Regions:
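Carbohydrate-interacting/catalytic domains
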Residues: 1-17, 22, 355-356, 365-375, ...
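Hydrophobic faces of well-ordered beta-strands that scaffold small-molecule active sites
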Residues: 15-17, 67, 132-134, 203, ...
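Conserved, mostly hydrophobic/aromatic
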Residues: 19, 69, 97, 125, ...
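Short, flexible loop/turn elements at secondary-structure junctions
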Residues: 20-25, 63, 71-73, 96, ...
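Substrate-binding/active-site clefts of carbohydrate-active enzymes
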Residues: 22-198, 211-227, 231, 243
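A solvent-exposed, charged loop/short amphipathic helix patch at secondary-structure junctions
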Residues: 29-48, 342-352, 356, 395-397
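Non-transmembrane alpha-helical segments in soluble domains
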Residues: 56-61, 122, 191-195, 220, ...
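Conserved alpha/beta catalytic core and glycan-binding cleft of carbohydrate-active enzymes
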Residues: 220-221, 229-382, 392, 448, ...
């Protein structure tokens, strides 16, 4: 009864942190008692061997606003009766949508335990000022013929191909039919149940492109009656073409038909790190030219902007968001290699210091973008997965977050923490309004490839800083930039960030060091 949603003034203020329950706490270095359980996030005062905060205290220290929990409903791939055996899965294989998974509870045999412990976790996060996002996978189920849906009304809840086969837009054996009245009703009621019963504050829709636009908008409308601040976003794609007309699908290209629902920008992600299909091929971050426009597309939040020429953007040849808060800005997530592994794969000869510098540069793009920033748990301390590309069922040894990394890469952690603090303190970085972004975010002319620079001008969005210049350089050498003449305070340089200032620069030229970002203001 005393559980309150932490305040959220605008979707532009959202900062997402994506985590898996086991990854977060299973390592001995977490210092957490309830390892791999919902209760792990209720433990305060937990520390690593070097006495640095872990778990929920780490999240508070980092400053994120929302924890995005990988699937936490009851999924099929982990056998709750055999928890003494090593089992791991992300959980994208739904069995029962409306109850927490027992493997994350302290006693899967007592039905009330998982429910109570999940609620304790939500309550603890809320008390810590953090909202909770549930990853929902209504697009397919683990079983088809033996599923609850098929047993209820055979042939109704799943789409079929013309020749009567199960359609497979999910790549997992089936795809549900959200366009049918009772599947739509099921999804809406399930979402409302998680909100009312478990106080969930947001939803991330797996393969949202399989669902239809009308269902997504009806979910948004139903949520708005309870609390419009509950955040909705999803993957604006499918694994293969769903059995429904393209103009009805909740794909990225149709986001403009879904107000206040956001989608991930793979344009920005792959413009920074390279495509998902070849881990050894890098992009902007490793100094490959030609990705600048895809990144500018991400910086403005996938909206129309006079300086973003959409023809040169990868994947999308036109802006797809009406508002910047409809775009999720990110460089890595649970899928594919995590950022540290990807950088290593694309730059095998780079030193640890060089890789750390690029990790910082990548996160600077994410947290200075007008989209909604998203970070994969552990990227703030160069977490790795030993090079595994798809770790959905890899053992803990691959997936766990080693909290000793927080000591080894303290500078990366402090830098990301600094970026988040700057974003929260300065509304210019989160305008949340497309017209304002077009008016007050201007890209500066650059002579080189692999350099992107922009100015947030005239106290953008009521900011106390009059003009803010963000310059991002992935070249192996420093670059000279022409800037509006004046005296500026340096906030970020050489992989350090300090809002009180790191010194002054004046004149109409700026030297931006190699493989790093520079942020100055007046």
């Amino acid at each position: 009864a005393d559980d309150k949603r932490p305040a959220l003034a605008s979707p532009a203020d959202v900062i997402l942190y994506e985590m898996h329950h086991r990854d977060m706490s299973i390592d001995p270095s977490s210092g957490i008692e309830h390892k791999g359980k919902f209760l792990a996030l209720t433990e305060q005062g937990t520390v690593s061997p070097d006495k640095l905060a872990t778990g929920i205290d780490h999240l508070k220290e980092l400053g994120i606003t929302h924890v995005h929990l990988l699937p936490s409903y009851d999924y099929a791939s982990v056998d709750e009766t055999k928890l003494d055996k090593a089992q791991y899965n992300w959980g994208y294989d739904p069995q029962n949508y409306n109850v927490p998974d027992g493997s994350y509870s302290t006693d899967p045999y007592k039905p009330d335990v998982r429910i109570r412990e999940f609620k304790q976790m939500v309550q603890a996060l809320h008390k810590a000022g953090i909202r909770v996002v549930l990853d929902v996978v209504y697009n397919h189920t683990f079983n088809t013929d033996e599923s609850n849906f098929e047993r209820t009304v055979p042939g109704y809840f799943y789409r079929q191909t013309k020749d009567g086969q199960w359609a497979n837009g999910s790549g997992c054996g089936n795809e549900t039919a959200s366009d049918r009245a009772m599947m739509r009703k099921y999804m809406i009621e399930s979402i409302l149940y998680w909100i009312n019963e478990y106080h969930i504050d947001g939803f991330r829709f797996d393969l949202m492109g399989i669902h239809d636009i009308e269902t997504m908008n009806e979910i948004r409308a139903a949520i708005d009656k309870i609390d419009p601040s509950i955040f909705m976003y999803g993957e604006g794609w499918a694994a293969s073409s769903p059995q429904l007309e393209a103009d009805r699908l909740a794909m990225k290209a149709n986001v403009e038909k879904m107000p206040r629902i956001a989608a991930f920008s793979d344009e920005m992600r792959d413009g920074l790190r390279g495509g998902w299909d070849d881990d050894t091929k890098g992009a902007f971050l490793v100094g490959e030219p030609g990705h600048e426009m895809s990144i500018k597309f991400g910086i403005v939040g996938a909206i129309e902007h006079p300086q973003v020429i959409s023809d040169s953007v990868n994947y999308s040849k036109k802006p797809w968001a009406l508002q910047p808060t409809q775009m999720i800005s990110y460089v890595s997530c649970h899928d594919d290699m995590c950022l540290a592994d990807r950088l290593k794969a694309t730059m095998p000869d780079a030193s640890v210091e060089e890789l750390a510098a690029l990790q910082k540069l990548a996160e600077t793009f994410v947290f200075t973008s007008q989209g909604v920033p998203f970070i994969f748990a552990g990227d703030e301390m160069m977490r790795d997965k030993k090079g595994v590309h798809n770790s959905y069922n890899s053992p803990d040894s691959i997936n766990t977050i080693d909290w000793k990394n927080k000591t080894a890469h303290k500078d990366v952690f402090e830098y990301v923490k600094g970026l988040i603090a700057m974003r929260k303190a300065h509304p210019a970085f989160r305008m949340g309004d497309a017209d304002m972004v077009r008016r007050q975010l201007e890209f500066l002319p650059v002579e080189n490839t692999n350099v992107v620079a922009f100015i947030l001008k005239d106290n953008a969005n009521g900011d106390s800083w009059k003009n803010i210049i963000v310059a991002l350089n992935s070249r192996a050498e420093p670059v000279k930039l022409d800037i509006p003449s004046g005296k500026y305070t340096v906030i970020c340089k050489d992989g350090k960030i300090n809002m009180k200032g790191l010194g002054q620069v004046s004149g109409d030229e700026l030297m931006v060091p190699a493989r790093s970002a520079m942020i100055i203001h007046q």
